[in-house]
Amino acid sequence: MLCGKLPNKPAVFAHRGDWAQERENTIGAFRAAVEAGADGIELDVRITRDGRLVVHHDPLIEQVAVSRMTYPNIPEWVPSLTDALDACYPLRVNIEVKVDDAASGLAMRTVEALNELLRVRAEAPENWVISSFDSRALDHMRFLNSNFRLGLLCWKKPWQPSMEHAVSKGYSALHPHEGLVDAELSESASAAGIERCVWAVSDPKRARGLATAGGTRWITDMPA
């Protein structure tokens, strides 16, 4: 495991599953991450035209927007979110709400469907982390259900506005890209009492440096 011998070992979440073993964001990748001993799994969720939640990173599948496809036309290798969460059990899961066009309303539809799906599952609400680059999606989720942990994704400098926004909104965590993480960010997060979920940690040398800077959770392409 990438950080098995590091000090201040964070919780390790497999980025889209263990896709060194299987195709990313597939049932096989999620099962491989469970077998690899990951602490959790990160995956991406999108909504189809007929309101089904599927796990896929990119906006298109075979040059067609997921949001314009009906579920029966989704390829078999793209899992439904329900099947994906079943494959991830018993690990914690970070569900990223993908937002490509904030004005389209897709993010709100996705969050509403996500809340309906999660609230009837047997796992405790603490099992889920809902993340997004779009704070409006996170705010809508909190309006619908205040029990889920929320994380704001951040990948560009300066990171300070994202940190300030996450703190002011009362989110559980900031999810910075690993290239942004330094002592200043870590100290700022600690002072604000907000968690850091760092993505996507894959280089062992960089991992050693990040271990010094700290982080509550790492999302990594190398869970094993």
Question: PLM features: residue spans?
Answer:
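Phosphate-group recognition and catalysis centered on beta-loop-alpha active-site segments
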Residues: 1-224
